[in-house]
Amino acid sequence: MKNLSLAALFTLALTACGGGGSSGDGSAASAPSSPVPPAGTADFATRCAQPGVLRCVGFDSASDLAGTWGDNSGSLAGASTPVLDPTVKASGASSLKFTIPSNSPADTSGSYFTNFSADLQTQFSANAEFYVQWRQRFSPEFLNTVFTGGGGWKQAIIGAGDKPGCNAATSSNGLCTSSCTALETVVQNTFQRGFAQMYNSCTGSSSHGAFNPFEEPFGGDFKLQNARPSPFCLYSQTNTTPKTSFSPGTCIGYFPNEWMTFQVKIKTGPRVNDEWTNSFVTLWIAREGQPSQLAITWGPYALTAASPGEDLKFGKVWLLPYNTGKSSAQTHPTGFTWYDELIISRTRIADPR
């Protein structure tokens, strides 16, 4: 990555755990064809009943948020606290609402987390495949604010699951995993560019550094959503005045006041030392009422696996708008983002109805 020196840009801008990414010198990912999610649509209950589903969270009950650090699922507070919102929802009784207050630091809103299974027995390591789908809504204030110092707010972190024995009493013994793990695979509005991007790992591994962005070299440029059709979603488009990421560029952006759908597929390959080699990561995005579109297809790639002795496995998802580097000195409009219909599955998940 010589022409634009993105490695330097990422290192300078995003340094905290859970931040954006510094590009390593790992696998140069190509963009093999990847099928779109299955034809047809389904409501939340129908999607939850499909074969392979491991966990569904509708954010319809106070019990969904009741857990805390050391529990199987729950929420953690930041400058504000996640709450259920019965007035804005994709389905059911309520949704999960995050508030981004004025003059808030990086942890603007806290986080929600859940393991893939209640007994911690369903986790994924080498030669495995799983999917995570959620719906998300954004207020105009949240999308339109450029947050001073912010490296870009996150949407979801898919990372290491807790180990058997994790509870509030044992949480300091290494059995409970935080959002910042070697495995983490993250969807983020990197550099506040206005569209979803992805990166891997809070630590790095043999072939690449920490926060390794999924950016495909393209001549003297980079594809940031590398599965988009011509004229593509390019780094250079983010630096024009005005920006051309969305026209003529084909980046899939965020849209206010509608329930967008995001689905991530992770397919791990065989373990080689501290990596799962020949792995693939896929991201689909859909606007409300429209079919999913392929945004990112990344691989073959060496996903960080941590050392074999750590025995970390994918098994936990975090939902959060954490924004590394965000200045608490900035006065800005209060923003909001909502989540609903979280599904974790062994098989691809249909689009919402």
Model segments located where?
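Ser/Thr-rich, Pro/Gly/Ala-heavy low-complexity intrinsically disordered linkers and tails
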Residues: 1, 23-38
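Sec-dependent signal peptide recognition
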Residues: 1-9
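C-terminal motif of bacterial Sec signal peptides marking the signal peptidase cleavage site
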Residues: 14-16
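Bacterial signal peptide processing site
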Residues: 18-22
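Low-complexity, Ser/Thr/Pro/Gly-rich disordered linker/stalk regions
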Residues: 31-353
